[in-house]
């Protein structure tokens, strides 16, 4: 499949009136995420999935005051592994990039963000190309990535916008890399 909405697994289905998303607005589906797609705004998270504190169990930082249970990352990888391939046609999917991160980490024996910083970004003199930019910079130094995100219920600044990468803790093969226009230009120059 091109995309799996993993984040639906952290939402309590009993807290949603009707389907989680639909093509028209009503009293429960007020959050518009695309031209013809409205999401339920008043959902609750499944018990044991989300905390407002970083603890040994809740380690995947999704947004300010929002930590996901660390077991969820493994459930994402298991669901991807169970996906059937459609060998008849090509469909773009970011799932292969999520798996690519696992390959990089297995081969290098390092977390992907640390490996890339050490082997690529630092040697190129890139100071602002990184995952998890809030570990080095303030929000005032980072462009916001989303306004009133439907899942995290807040403006997103310094956290990855992509829900899959957010559910992976902000470091993923499919999304989560922050940079500046100048540093992206340096990467393109290197490729030339």
Regions found by a protein language model. Give the residues of each.
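Short, surface-exposed loop or secondary-structure junction motifs
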Residues: 1-192
């Amino acid at each position: 499949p091109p995309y799996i909405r993993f984040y639906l697994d952290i939402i309590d289905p009993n807290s949603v009136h009707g389907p989680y998303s639909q093509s028209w607005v009503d009293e429960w589906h007020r959050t518009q995420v695309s031209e013809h797609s409205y999401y339920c705004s008043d959902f609750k998270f499944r018990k044991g999935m989300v905390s407002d504190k970083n603890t040994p169990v809740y380690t995947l930082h999704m947004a300010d005051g929002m930590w996901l249970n660390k077991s969820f990352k493994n459930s994402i990888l298991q669901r991807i592994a169970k996906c059937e391939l459609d060998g008849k046609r090509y469909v773009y999917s970011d799932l292969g990039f999520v798996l690519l991160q696992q390959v990089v980490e297995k081969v290098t024996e390092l977390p992907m963000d640390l490996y890339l910083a050490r082997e690529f970004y630092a040697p190129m003199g890139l100071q602002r190309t990184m995952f998890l930019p809030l570990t080095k910079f303030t929000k005032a130094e980072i462009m916001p990535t989303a306004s009133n995100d439907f899942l995290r219920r807040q403006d997103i600044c310094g956290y990855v916008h992509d829900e899959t990468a957010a559910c992976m803790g902000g470091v993923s093969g499919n999304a989560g890399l922050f940079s500046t226009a100048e540093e992206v230009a340096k990467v393109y120059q290197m490729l030339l």
